[in-house]
């Protein structure tokens, strides 16, 4: 079976997933590919492990940005692909191989058939953490080429190929990591009265955290606290001196994020007093909500609805986190879901997006940026 050039690129990238700010092979792959393109109208910069590319327009009055994230996840792949990850314990399980490939496809199309306006492509590292969008946005490398508008996409396993799903306004939630370390006093299991058991303290803390959302967030708003990992103790007959909770917070409103964190801190202070222990809270990486510019999103959806190869869906907001929200906070633009029809979802070891979505997305986005970038 013959596959397209860009499907092959996706397969190449799929084999070399790398974690945040470690995407050296991916960066080099992108740079090597760019060297194959006509270069008289291209300028290239590197930023950490990312790549920024400017395609100079024929008669520019504005700059249109396209952002593609590059990093993978610490997941052991179970797809059965012949082109599965060659990096042990790492996988492109969130579609960033698709995102980067589509970006390279759009770059190729616009280099070979330039539009009037300038285009800037942001191949961004570390979306999965610790977060690359905000520092890239604030970097000296981007200041000179900062777009006037920007767009990005994310694959959506639940939608069929040919589907574009988005909405005006809030699309993705505010998110924050959550790490809580408890330290008490260890001891022999036979003498619990001489120790402060951090397994018990952690258990009480998990239970009490369940009240934060149900009793402190407006039922008409949405928020989630999930504790996904608990560690503590060393062996079965020693009372644990330390324990650690790892989780995530997600809220639709900025106000709810502050309220949730205030309540978490109050509950943790109560645990410290009740169990005579010390606690440290770390919120890790925090991502701003993805808020689509209303007018640009409406215009984009109207344009897409005229394409007979695309089905446009107005979706609901999701509790998904995306550091692209920082870019949209500073630059008007939007993000949309791209249907890839996979039985397994994002962050799953068996995620298998339909590669037919790649060339269709490139063709559609090329038509959109031509239309948008040639308007006066």
Curated annotation (Swiss-Prot):
UniProt-listed Gene3D superfamilies: 3.30.70.360, Zn peptidases (3.40.630.10)
Residue numbers annotated as active site: 69, 128 (proton acceptor)
GO BP: any one term: lysine biosynthetic process via diaminopimelate
UniProt GO MF annotations: N-acetyldiaminopimelate deacetylase activity
InterPro entries in UniProt: AcetylDAP_deacetylase (IPR023905), Amidohydrolase (IPR017439), Bact_exopeptidase_dim_dom (IPR036264), Peptidase_M20 (IPR002933), Peptidase_M20_dimer (IPR011650)
EC number: 3.5.1.47
Annotated function: Catalyzes the conversion of N-acetyl-diaminopimelate to diaminopimelate and acetate.
Catalytic activity: N-acetyl-(2S,6S)-2,6-diaminopimelate + H2O = (2S,6S)-2,6-diaminopimelate + acetate
Pathway: Amino-acid biosynthesis; L-lysine biosynthesis via DAP pathway; LL-2,6-diaminopimelate from (S)-tetrahydrodipicolinate (acetylase route): step 3/3
UniProt keyword terms in alphabetical order: Amino-acid biosynthesis, Diaminopimelate biosynthesis, Hydrolase, Lysine biosynthesis
The name this protein goes by in its record: N-acetyldiaminopimelate deacetylase
Protein family per UniProt: Belongs to the peptidase M20A family. N-acetyldiaminopimelate deacetylase subfamily.
Name of one Pfam family that matches: M20_dimer
Highest taxon listed in the record's lineage: Bacteria
């Amino acid at each position: 079976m013959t596959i397209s050039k860009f499907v092959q690129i996706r397969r190449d990238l799929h084999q070399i997933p790398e974690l945040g700010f470690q995407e050296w092979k991916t960066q080099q792959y992108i740079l090597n590919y760019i060297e194959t393109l006509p270069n008289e109208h291209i300028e290239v910069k590197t930023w950490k492990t990312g790549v920024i590319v400017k395609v100079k327009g024929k008669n520019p009055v504005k700059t249109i940005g396209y952002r593609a994230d590059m990093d993978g996840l610490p997941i052991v792949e179970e797809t059965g692909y012949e082109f599965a990850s060659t990096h042990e314990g790492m996988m492109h399980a969130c579609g960033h191989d698709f995102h980067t490939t589509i970006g390279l496809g759009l770059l190729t199309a616009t280099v070979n058939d330039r539009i009037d306006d300038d285009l800037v492509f942001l191949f961004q590292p570390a979306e999965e953490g610790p977060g690359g969008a905000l520092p890239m946005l604030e970097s000296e490398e981007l200041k000179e080429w900062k777009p006037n508008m920007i767009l990005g996409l994310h694959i959506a396993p639940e939608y069929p190929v040919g589907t574009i799903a988005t909405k005006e306004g809030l699309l993705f939630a505010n998110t924050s990591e959550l790490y809580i370390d408890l330290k008490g006093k260890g001891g022999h299991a036979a003498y619990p009265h001489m120790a402060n058991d951090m397994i018990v303290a952690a258990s009480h803390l998990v239970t009490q955290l369940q009240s934060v959302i149900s009793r402190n967030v407006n039922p008409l708003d949405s928020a989630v606290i999930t504790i996904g990992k608990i560690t503590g103790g060393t062996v079965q007959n020693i009372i644990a001196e330390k324990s650690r909770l790892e989780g995530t917070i997600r809220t639709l409103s900025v106000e709810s994020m502050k309220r949730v964190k205030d309540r978490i801190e109050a509950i943790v202070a109560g645990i410290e007093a009740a169990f005579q222990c010390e606690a440290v809270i770390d919120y890790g990486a925090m991502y701003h909500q993805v808020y689509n510019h209303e007018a640009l999103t409406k215009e984009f959806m109207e344009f897409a609805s005229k394409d007979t190869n695309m089905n446009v869906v107005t979706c609901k907001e999701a509790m998904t986190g995306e550091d692209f929200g920082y870019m949209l906070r500073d630059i008007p633009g939007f993000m949309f879901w791209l249907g890839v029809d996979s039985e397994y979802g994002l962050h799953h070891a068996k995620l298998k997006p339909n590669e037919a979505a790649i060339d269709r997305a490139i063709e559609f986005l090329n038509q959109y940026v031509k239309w948008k970038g040639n308007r006066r």
